[in-house]
Design a protein with these regions (language model features):
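Walker A/P-loop NTP-binding motif
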Residues: 38-42, 73-87, 107-111
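Walker A/P-loop
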Residues: 47-78
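A substrate-engagement module of RecA-like helicase motors
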Residues: 2-18, 25, 49-57, 87-90, ...
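Signature of the SF2 helicase/ATPase Hel1-core->accessory helical subdomain module
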Residues: 76, 82, 99-102, 107-110, ...
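Conserved interdomain hinge at the start of the Helicase C-terminal
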Residues: 469, 526-563
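A contiguous, basic/glycine-rich beta-loop/short-helix subdomain that forms a polymer-engagement track
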Residues: 199-235, 243-253, 387-529, 538-539, ...
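Conserved helicase motor "Helicase C" RecA-like lobe of SF1/SF2 P-loop NTPases
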Residues: 563-587
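Conserved RecA-like P-loop NTPase helicase motor core
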Residues: 526-537, 588-697
Length: 716
């Protein structure tokens, strides 16, 4: 229950914004969101001393759909910040995109502090991989870096291939700038793009980290940043970092869930982000390289730690795993679904050959092979972790070999990370779910451009149970928000995907839009007779209709959204000549350049037409005359073309369900709402949405999809 102190603090600081910002208008929807968040967080269950952790069923969790214009970030920062301070928690704000993270840290939080008078401290959290490791950097850039503790040339271990002069020069430049404190060690702060292969050599990773024993601990960018996170009220992160922390048990990178209130913005991205986090994959080639090189490392570790027996066990496990992987070569070579096309053209036409294990079941006759591979990987991981612990102990005890042990620990970290990845894959591949449980998706792909390499993959088909048990049931409180969370007028899809459907006390709230859609916009569905199921005829129809809908001389912006890159390109090529100079096609220019040219054309009194795909249907902000018309070529149905979706669809069908109705249509509803949402961005905007897909009229689900769109005036 909210205390009077909390109520007064929220009211007073919100009123301060109006006093300090001329023209600020309190919005009813924003106030409603503030109240909903504060009330949810006030219901947090606390753990009394000597008692077990409280059983949380969603009483302090709210799912809030806040349309564009509500002012969501101000609402959750104000309510969440105050509630975190009064309840002794930390506020963790997580977003899906870098753009929103930067907006929160650079604009929204400073604005709130300045205008409301609320004293909030905040910091941006990033994963280890965004920071360099000074120890690795200095080792690679010292004059003797071509020789290392293993007695091997650096290219053999520190580099996968001989470093180029420009690569070494770049690392020396980075080292010079870092040591002079002109570069803070954050990859995003380096003025030029650093190639992934180069950054991997100097990045901070948990296995290679020397922690408190590191001679460069005092200048380590990662630890300096983490120290700051321990002192602030608000931590701004992204979904990937949040999920990484949860997968490690929580409280490793970010504050512990039990001590945190979460604001999950752009929450509709969370389920698929979580799936990626809980999945695993490894390359056959990289695994073999790792296992072949490993004995050179274990021998050196044994000599420095007196752990010869443990090193021998690791070598035996590595040999066993290597034998298993070589055995897999025979099985993979005989699998028809992994055969490559007979010509280079065939390879380019098709995706990489994939062997999907139907229903996640291990193929007949391979049960023992899968089990043996998993056992060998698990055993190897156990032994290399033991060797790593021995290295850490030796580093604390031995002074004379300190530098050698440091170098070896850092290099060994790469191998542990890869072995951990291999073991995770085979743990999933060997898992047999209990009868009635969701299957795991399991598949193997073959590189079309490298016929000798295969990728082993495994993934849950849903992240719901992981999120429910690892996050929601542990968190002190959470709010999930986005402009689009409902599908077909219901929160069921997002609740099911996130696992919140299992927490019955979770509250949901759909806020009213501040826009007058019936006067600001129109919805037009022209009589397009060609069905999208006939791609050629439908493309011809779009080419016919666009000149009727878009003037080549009126100085307004038009956004045309396609579901197919091929159709987008075909239409662009077949439009009348006078339209070609007006076109800005996604993929032909960097996004920032494309948008800059679009705004410039409008400012110069010219028409401008953007052709875009699904990614332009979300997050693109084109207010005013920059977007007066949105044309949707086809309903955004996603085809179940990846192994996870195929496995999920089969499981639904086996349970008597219909994946098209249960998944495809609801997800299309969300995408369609997002696409339509590109039109009206402010209370002054106006325009028209046109849908060139006759299925909204001819199919029953079409009316369901239309019913969920803003109440524009219908024409035609």
């Amino acid at each position: 229950m909210l205390t009077d102190l909390e109520k007064n603090a929220i009211r007073d600081h919100y009123q301060n914004i109006g006093k300090n910002l001329p023209g600020f208008r309190p919005r009813a929807s924003q106030r409603e969101m503030i109240a909903a968040i504060a009330n949810a967080f006030s219901r947090t269950l606390t753990r009394e001393e000597g008692e077990e952790a409280p059983k949380r069923e969603g009483e302090s969790i709210a799912v809030i759909e806040g349309p564009t214009g509500v002012g969501k970030s101000l609402a959750y920062l104000l309510a969440g910040g105050i509630m975190a301070q009064t309840r002794g928690k930390r506020l963790i704000v997580s977003s899906a995109t870098v753009a929103l993270q930067e907006q929160l840290v650079d604009r929204d939080l400073p604005f709130l502090v300045e205008k409301s008078g609320l004293e909030l401290t905040f910091a941006l959290a990033k994963g280890r991989g965004r920071y360099l490791c000074p120890y690795k950097l200095y080792q690679l850039t010292q004059n003797n870096a071509q020789q290392n503790v293993l007695g091997l040339e650096a290219p053999e271990v520190l580099w996968d291939s001989k470093p180029k002069p420009e690569e070494l020069n770049l690392l020396r430049d980075i080292a010079d700038e870092f040591s002079a404190r002109r570069f803070n060690g954050d990859r995003d702060a380096w003025p030029e793009k650093i190639d992934d292969a180069i950054w991997l050599k100097v990045t901070n990773d948990r296995h290679g980290c020397l922690k408190s024993a590191c001679p460069n601990r005092a200048e380590c960018p990662f630890y300096l940043a983490r120290d700051v996170l321990e002192t602030v009220d608000v931590v701004v992160a992204n979904h990937d970092l949040l999920l990484a922390d949860i997968s490690m048990g929580g409280g490793v990178i970010l504050p512990a869930p039990e001590n945190s209130f979460y604001c999950i913005d752009e929450a509709h991205h969370l389920p698929k982000k979580a799936l990626s986090r809980f999945a695993a994959e490894h390359s056959w080639n990289i695994a073999v390289w790792t296992l072949e090189k490993l004995p050179q490392l274990t021998g050196k570790i044994a000599a420095l730690t007196d752990k010869a027996e443990l090193a021998n066990l690791a070598d035996e496990a590595a040999t066993s795993l290597l034998d298993s992987l070589h055995e897999w070569q025979f099985h993979l070579a005989e699998e028809p679904s992994l055969s490559l096309g007979s010509s280079e053209n065939d390879r380019r036409k098709h995706n990489e050959p994939t062997w999907l294990w139907e229903d996640g079941k291990i193929p007949e006759g391979l049960e023992t092979t899968v089990s043996n591979t998993a056992i060998a990987a698990r055993s190897l991981l156990k032994h290399v972790i033991g060797l790593n612990d021995a290295l850490s102990a030796a580093r604390r005890e031995k002074e004379q070999d300190g530098a050698l042990l440091d170098r070896l620990t850092s290099e060994f970290g790469l191998f542990i990370a890869r072995i951990e990845q291999i073991s995770a894959v085979w743990d999933l591949l060997s898992t047999v779910p209990i009868e009635g449980e969701e299957p795991l998706a399991k598949w193997i792909t073959r590189h079309a451009d490298d016929k000798n390499d295969y990728i082993f993959n495994a993934s849950p088909i849903s992240s719901a149970s992981h999120l429910a048990n690892s996050l929601w049931r542990r968190a002190a409180g959470a709010v999930l928000t986005s402009a689009t969370l409902q599908s077909l007028g219901s929160f069921n899809l997002i609740l099911r995907q996130t696992g919140l459907l299992w927490l019955p006390e979770t509250t949901t709230l759909a806020l009213e839009s501040p826009f007058n859609f019936d006067t600001q916009g129109e919805l037009y569905i022209p009589p397009v007779h060609a069905s999208p199921k006939d791609p050629d005829a439908h493309t011809a129809a779009i080419v016919e209709w666009l000149p009727k809908l878009v003037s080549p001389v009126e100085a307004i912006g038009t956004l045309v959204l396609f579901s197919s890159r091929k159709q987008m390109q075909d239409v662009a090529l077949r439009l009348p000549d006078e339209y070609l100079p007006l076109l800005l096609v996604q993929g032909e220019l960097p996004k920032a350049v494309l948008l800059q040219r679009h705004h410039q054309a409008i400012a110069e009194g010219k028409a401008s037409i953007i052709f875009g795909l699904d990614s332009f249907a979300e997050g693109l902000d084109l207010p005013g005359t920059a977007c007066v018309q949105v044309i949707i070529a086809k309903l955004p149905f996603a085809m179940p073309d990846n192994p996870i979706e195929k496995t999920q669809n089969r499981w639904i069908e086996q349970r008597g369900g219909n994946p098209f109705i249960e998944i495809t249509v609801p997800e299309a509803s969300i995408k369609l709402i997002q696409a339509v949402g590109r039109l009206i961005r402010t209370e002054q905007d106006y325009g028209r949405v046109t849908i060139l897909d006759n299925r909204v009229k001819t199919q029953r689900y079409g009316q369901q999809l239309l019913a969920c769109l803003p109440p524009f005036k219908r024409i035609g």
